[in-house]
């Protein structure tokens, strides 16, 4: 048996072992933790990525222009939303108790985000950016106002419906949350099995597609610790794209990356948005926003407002 494995690619060895062992533990872990999405992004590539200039102030900012889609609709729609933070699981308290005991984070939120838009959320640490993202993917319960995400009414959402919502959303974590003892291919394979994919050839085809999107098609056999920080973040993005999301949520995705690698991640997000997937990214990196301008929402003193890039630094 060992001779057979020596003649096979490393990812294929892991794939065969997974089929034999079923690996229910990892499937359950991935399903509960990530539950990525099914609708939205078409196959594409990122090409001709240019290195950053040594002096970014001599460059003309490349303002992002969202793709205008026929039948454009709101992927996110918030009206009069107030967000309270609690450490209790979703749905474990009544709305009345949450209003009494939860910590007020943000109030009177009103905005729409459409398919194909790339939107920055910016503000100081603790200003509520992550709390908003957690509300959008139903880690925090919405108890005041109206909120619709990827076709789901957050006020009426039941706990059993959360996995269905998250299959329409791709989530990119700053701390990666990869399976460190499985290679790139198997990290993606477990997600697909956990979210209902059955056909093995379709699974392999989709994994090949998303690895090509993030320029990791030659790294399928690598273990996460063999990848650079930027490559690990690209793997996380590939994982979020597996189920073709309508919405991609990224919480400080460039926080642990060097400036050049961070710019590559922003260009990748912009390319994903051009294919019709709404991308919402929280960050405190104002230099990136100046270099790659796009719609920006500022968080300050429990409120939000849209700001032009030119006045953003004065308000933070």
Regions found by a protein language model. Name each.
Residues 1-5:
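Short, small-residue-biased leader/transition segments that mark boundaries at the very start
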Residues 223-227, 231-233:
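Conserved ABC ATPase signature
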Residues 182-190:
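Short coil-to-helix segment of the ABC ATPase nucleotide-binding domain corresponding to the Q-loop/switch region
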Residues 137:
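Helix-to-loop junction immediately C-terminal to a conserved catalytic motif
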Residues 145-153:
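Conserved ABC transporter NBD signature motif
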Residues 248-251:
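Catalytic Walker B motif of ABC-type/P-loop ATPase nucleotide-binding domains
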Residues 242-246:
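A short, proline-enriched helix->beta-strand linker immediately N-terminal to the Walker B motif
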């Amino acid at each position: 048996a060992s001779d057979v494995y020596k003649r096979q690619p490393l990812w294929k060895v892991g794939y065969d072992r997974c089929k034999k062992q079923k690996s229910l533990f990892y499937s359950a872990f991935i399903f509960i933790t990530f539950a990525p999405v099914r609708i939205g992004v078409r196959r594409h590539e990122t090409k001709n990525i240019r290195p950053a200039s040594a002096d970014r102030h001599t460059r003309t900012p490349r303002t992002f222009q969202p793709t205008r889609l026929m039948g454009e609709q709101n992927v996110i729609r918030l009206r009069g939303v107030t967000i309270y933070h609690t450490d209790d699981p979703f749905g474990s308290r009544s709305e009345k108790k949450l209003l009494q005991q939860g910590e007020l984070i943000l109030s009177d939120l009103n905005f729409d985000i459409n398919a194909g838009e790339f939107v920055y959320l910016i503000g100081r640490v603790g200003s509520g950016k992550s709390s908003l993202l957690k509300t959008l993917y139903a880690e925090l319960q919405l108890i005041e106002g109206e909120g619709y995400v990827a076709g789901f009414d957050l006020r009426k959402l039941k706990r059993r419906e959360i996995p269905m919502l998250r299959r329409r959303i791709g989530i990119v974590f700053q701390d990666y949350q990869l399976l460190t003892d499985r290679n790139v291919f198997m990290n993606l394979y477990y997600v697909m099995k956990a979210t209902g994919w059955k056909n093995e050839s379709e699974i392999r085809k989709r994994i090949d597609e998303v690895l090509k999107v993030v320029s990791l098609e030659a790294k399928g056999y690598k273990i996460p610790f063999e990848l650079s920080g930027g490559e690990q973040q690209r793997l996380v993005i590939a994982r979020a794209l597996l189920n073709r999301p309508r919405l991609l949520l990224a919480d400080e995705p460039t926080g642990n990356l060097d400036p050049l690698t961070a710019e590559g991640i922003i260009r990748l997000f912009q390319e994903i948005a051009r294919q019709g997937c709404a991308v919402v990214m929280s960050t405190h990196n104002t230099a990136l926003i100046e270099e790659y301008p796009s719609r920006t929402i500022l968080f300050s003193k429990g409120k939000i407002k849209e700001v032009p890039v030119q006045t953003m630094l004065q308000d933070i």
